């Protein structure tokens, strides 16, 4: 098991936490992380782009003028894709970009992401981060004491005061253990775990 210093809100070491090797110390494969991040981003796409085809644009379907004898090129209706304001051929239509990756691969990628943070010395543990009230200034002061910028904070409960205190701080995000995901872990430079959240995270892989 890997031992990590547990800090208080002033950035001082108060104890040690031990992280399970099967979750925080596994070999990292960039290809697996890439596949899962790509899947997450694909699921976020709205897929709402839409253009009108010739059957959907407004206008008459009558032939504009006779086929022969005018000296002009032959022409059909005003809705032809060849004309200004006509329909679009093979234009975009609403669709879902979401696709699935096996559950075991997603779980493996999450463990790899956690392991990569520990290996890069970008994982920190704090004993508690509970806020008595919604105070953005106080939250920012704690982050400064910890020396962490661009940080993902993982909590094990619904701490409304903490979430709202962090909301306006740029490059800081607070999520619960249930929402922990590969994309957010890799997006932020630092990962800060509440000490009580460690067991919750490790428990996700033993259920």
UniProtKB/Swiss-Prot annotation:
One of its GO terms (molecular function) is rRNA binding. Keywords: Ribonucleoprotein, Ribosomal protein, RNA-binding, rRNA-binding. One of its GO terms (biological process) is translation. It comes from the Bacteria. Residues 69-78 have a biased composition (Polar residues). GO terms for cellular component: ribonucleoprotein complex; ribosome. Residues 43-80 are annotated as: Disordered. It holds the Pfam family Ribosomal_L4. One of the primary rRNA binding proteins, this protein initially binds near the 5'-end of the 23S rRNA. It is important during the early stages of 50S assembly. It makes multiple contacts with different domains of the 23S rRNA in the assembled 50S subunit and ribosome. Belongs to the universal ribosomal protein uL4 family. HAMAP family: Ribosomal_uL4_B (MF_01328_B). Part of the 50S ribosomal subunit. NCBIfam families: rplD_bact (TIGR03953). This is Large ribosomal subunit protein uL4. It comes from Desulforapulum autotrophicum (strain ATCC 43914 / DSM 3382 / VKM B-1955 / HRM2) (Desulfobacterium autotrophicum). The lineage of its organism: Bacteria, Pseudomonadati, Thermodesulfobacteriota, Desulfobacteria, Desulfobacterales.
